[in-house]
């Protein structure tokens, strides 16, 4: 058995795995009245596949002595710091559950120098009224002995080395601290500067009612929170596989000082992954791994690092050699995964360009050039070509589809497709009110000239152009709602807004929240064509999540694709109107303008 003397107590500990050069160990802290083994015996051996794992009994628990017969989170946190140092480590990845989560949190605040990363689970930063009310009856020794036979037997068995009736003192000492400490303010938490992941089950009866996990994550700078749905107090037991994945991923992303520096840089410069993935990591052995979008981002990574990596294994998705392509069909779904059953995240229209990052059988992972969105498309929808060919084709486009759907025929006068509104096309020639369009792959389709508008006559974002385009998009009233949709086959809210502006030659970000951030703030009454944004407050931190956008028609009236009507429809801010909707009025977050 292994013991180490720390702050006058003999601390018993077990270890799993092997020490790895340059890598901080994982230090697991058990919960109230438990021991290291009773709390962590399932996950510790699994974590040991990748880490050296230290599992102690806290002072006064199991085999660890309690010479002063005391119990306080600050004393136990001092023991954590002392044990880490006594075992020859500068820092550790400190993970604690329940009261152990509190100890981990106190260690984080009071002894940050021994923290590499910190994962408090089911912890509380302050003593909420429900704890004062609920905990004393639960931790009453007589109640435990009389009503909780399994817990009673466990207490005797786990803490027998400290005396036959020691368990009674332990539960009384424990509950006294639970209803007294910790008491950290937002300002206290704001002073923390170590990587922190807060874990709390959605149904945790101890901590969830007062949202302790969200409170901690809100105020610790750059802290992350994981609140798994349908899970109670012991997340690491209830969903062990997912818990292990989350912990390993967090430590992989933020587990070294260099990786943390890269992570903070990512939050500052590349937080929105929709604009391009930026996920570099530097292992404890100095090897640079992870993924970034392009070579420019790779250069940023190397500049951020103080010391060049021992080896550069960073994956760069788009390089000079990455193939170019043009969308070669009127419409192609862009999906999150290479499956027809996967989420549709957006759509691409014919003639739009993309970089082909990866091909997997019938599917290709692409990044659309016009809005930066990435996803999987059918490989057959792509015309692979050079950048020069892309630029040539797009520069030749001289008409835009102004019909809702322009019927296209082949050279045998057979209807082959319908080309959606706002598609740019290359008209080679025109004869008897029929336009001959050349596709990216060279095929020729015939379309009625009246369904097209020459680019020289395309409306712009002046008052007249906006009015003309508003008249055109109002034809879409009744078109079904379609998640990810950008065409009259089906729109989502931001897809309709983006299509409205793209017809006038303006590219705006794909999603509503991105648009809200990028557009010019409209002061006063929105004008026709301004975009109106909506979103609910996040109850955890009072921030607003923009989730919806509409196109203003002037005054109180607007047009939008929405789930309430499951289609494109009109609504109004006028309380007396039959098309007034309370949610839209209450959650309106302002207008934006693009030019």
What are these regions (language model features)?
Residues 384, 390-392, 453-455, 459, ...:
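Aromatic- and glycine-rich peptidoglycan recognition patches
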Residues 41, 45-48, 55-95:
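Active-site loop/oxyanion-hole signature of alpha/beta-hydrolase fold enzymes
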Residues 9-63:
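Conserved HGGG/HGGXW glycine-rich cap/lid loop of the alpha/beta-hydrolase fold
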């Amino acid at each position: 058995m292994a013991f180490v003397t720390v702050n006058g107590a003999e601390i018993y500990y077990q270890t799993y795995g092997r020490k790895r050069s340059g890598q901080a160990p994982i230090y697991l802290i058990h919960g109230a009245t438990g021991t290291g083994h009773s709390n962590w015996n399932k996950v510790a051996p699994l974590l040991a596949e990748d880490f050296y794992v230290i599992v102690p009994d806290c002072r006064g628990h199991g085999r660890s002595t309690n010479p002063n017969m005391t119990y306080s989170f600050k004393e136990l946190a001092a023991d954590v710091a002392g044990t880490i140092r006594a075992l020859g480590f500068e820092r550790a990845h400190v993970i604690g559950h329940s009261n152990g989560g509190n100890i981990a949190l106190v260690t984080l605040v009071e002894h940050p120098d021994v923290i590499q990363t910190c994962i408090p689970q089911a912890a509380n930063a302050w003593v909420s009224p429900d704890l004062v009310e609920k905990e004393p009856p639960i931790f009453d020794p007589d109640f435990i002995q009389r009503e909780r036979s399994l817990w009673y037997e466990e207490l005797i068995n786990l803490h027998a080395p400290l005396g036959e009736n020691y368990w009674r003192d332990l539960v009384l000492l424990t509950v006294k601290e639970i209803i007294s400490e910790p008491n950290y303010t937002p300002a206290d938490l704001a002073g923390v500067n170590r990587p922190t992941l807060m874990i709390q089950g959605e149904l945790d009866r101890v901590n969830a009612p007062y949202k302790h996990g969200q409170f901690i994550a809100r105020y610790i700078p750059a802290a992350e929170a994981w609140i798994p749905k349908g899970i109670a107090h012991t997340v690491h037991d209830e969903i062990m596989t997912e818990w292990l994945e989350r912990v390993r991923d967090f430590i992989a992303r933020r587990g070294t000082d260099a990786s943390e520096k890269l992570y903070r840089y990512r939050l500052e410069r590349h937080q929105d992954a929709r604009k391009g993935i930026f996920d570099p990591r530097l292992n404890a052995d100095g090897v640079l791994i992870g993924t970034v979008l392009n070579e420019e981002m790779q250069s940023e990574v190397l500049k951020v690092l103080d010391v060049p990596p021992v080896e550069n294994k960073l994956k760069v998705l788009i390089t000079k050699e990455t193939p170019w392509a043009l969308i070669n069909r009127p419409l192609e779904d862009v999906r999150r995964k290479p499956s027809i059953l996967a989420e549709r995240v957006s759509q691409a229209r014919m003639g739009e360009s993309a970089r082909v990052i990866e091909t997997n059988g019938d599917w290709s992972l692409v990044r659309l050039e016009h809005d930066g969105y990435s996803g999987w498309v059918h490989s057959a929808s792509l015309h692979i070509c050079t950048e020069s060919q892309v630029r040539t084709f797009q520069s030749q486009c001289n008409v835009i589809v102004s019909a809702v759907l322009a019927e296209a025929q082949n050279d045998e006068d057979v209807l082959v497709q319908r080309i959606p509104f706002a598609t740019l096309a290359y008209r080679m020639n025109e004869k008897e009110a029929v336009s001959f369009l050349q596709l990216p792959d060279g095929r020729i389709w015939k379309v009625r000239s009246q369904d097209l508008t020459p680019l020289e006559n395309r409306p712009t974002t002046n008052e007249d152009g906006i009015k003309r385009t508003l008249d055109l998009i109002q034809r879409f009233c009744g078109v079904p709602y379609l998640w990810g949709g950008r065409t009259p086959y089906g729109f989502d809210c931001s897809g309709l807004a983006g299509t409205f502006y793209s017809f006038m030659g303006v590219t705006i970000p794909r999603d509503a929240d991105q648009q809200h951030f990028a557009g010019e703030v409209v002061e006063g009454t929105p004008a026709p064509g301004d975009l109106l944004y909506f979103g609910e407050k996040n109850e955890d931190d009072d921030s607003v999540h923009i989730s919806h956008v509409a196109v203003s028609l002037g005054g109180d009236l607007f047009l939008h694709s929405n789930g309430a009507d499951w289609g494109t429809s009109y609504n109004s801010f006028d309380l007396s109107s039959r098309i007034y909707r309370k949610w839209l009025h209450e959650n309106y977050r302002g207008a934006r303008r693009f030019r």
